[in-house]
Design a protein with these regions (language model features):
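Glycine-rich phosphate-binding loops of nucleotide-dependent enzymes
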Residues: 2-254
């Protein structure tokens, strides 16, 4: 089985290695991502999936290998470099300021100002309403602190922030963790909307069911190495479980 995608990937991590104190956390791993695609990264704690993706978000630096964005080699040394390549990360903690409303969170650190140099709260709220109308039309709580929002609504704000600032590559860390069924469905619909807009999404996950529901492809890592990549529609939960636990590659993997 081969990669079903053709053309130039949005991003390609090629032969990446990362070591800490002589221990290889990531050992010659390659993975790619195409526009309008969700790729799940799975593996036990310590498998290396988060470490691998953090070299794309700028949190870690690779020791070897290449990062290509739209087919061109890119140097990513910190999160600012990543944002310069339209890469945004949504961490499990969401990094939201609980005491601020949706608009203040969306523009936190990147506030809009008027011609006098003052923060333009009216314009920020209007822009927030516009982007939320696109992503989550049911969102109505614009004037309350995000601490008063549900988990799915908070996730909506974090996603809107990334999309507003022109993310083309989105890294999501267990976006449905600790959410109920209704909230999980809300996030699933958000992800489908982002796919339709041509974004590429890396989903760091532990939950196989979430991967089967949300992802197009799944890459499994074990002990810092890539076990294989599968097209989700071609495999079962048990196939992926075997890759995670045993490092066993099904015939459909590549």
């Amino acid at each position: 089985m081969t990669n079903p995608n053709t053309g130039t990937p949005l991003v390609e991590l090629r032969d990446i290695s990362i070591a800490f104190g002589g221990i290889k956390a990531v050992d010659h791993v390659s993975v790619d991502l195409y526009p309008g695609e969700v790729v799940g990264l799975l593996g036990h704690n310590g498998a290396g999936k988060s470490t691998l993706i953090k070299c794309l978000s700028g949190a870690y630096q690779k020791d070897a290998g290449q990062i290509l964005i739209n087919g061109k080699e890119a140097e990513i040394n910190d999160p600012r470099d990543a944002r310069g390549h339209n890469i945004e990360t949504i961490y499990q903690t969401l990094a939201l300021a609980d005491n601020l409303d949706a608009a203040s969170n969306l523009f936190l650190g990147r506030e809009l100002v008027n011609s006098f140099g003052f923060v333009d709260e009216t314009r920020m709220e209007a822009e927030t309403r516009k982007i939320m109308g696109r992503l989550n039309p049911n969102f109505k709580k614009f004037n309350v602190p995000v601490s008063a929002l549900s988990g799915g609504q908070r996730q909506s704000v974090a996603i809107a922030r990334a999309v507003y600032f022109n993310a083309k590559i989105l890294i999501m860390d267990e976006p449905t963790a600790a959410l109920g069924p209704h909230e999980t469905q809300m996030v699933a619909e958000l992800i489908q909307e982002l796919k339709a807009q041509g974004l590429g999404i890396f989903l760091i996950e532990h939950d196989i069911h979430s991967v089967m529901k949300l992802c197009d492809r799944a890459v499994v890592m074990k002990n810092g190495q890539r076990v294989g990549c599968v097209n989700v529609k071609d495999v079962t939960d048990d196939d992926i479980l075997g890759m995670i636990i045993m490092g066993k590659k099904p015939p459909q993997a590549y």
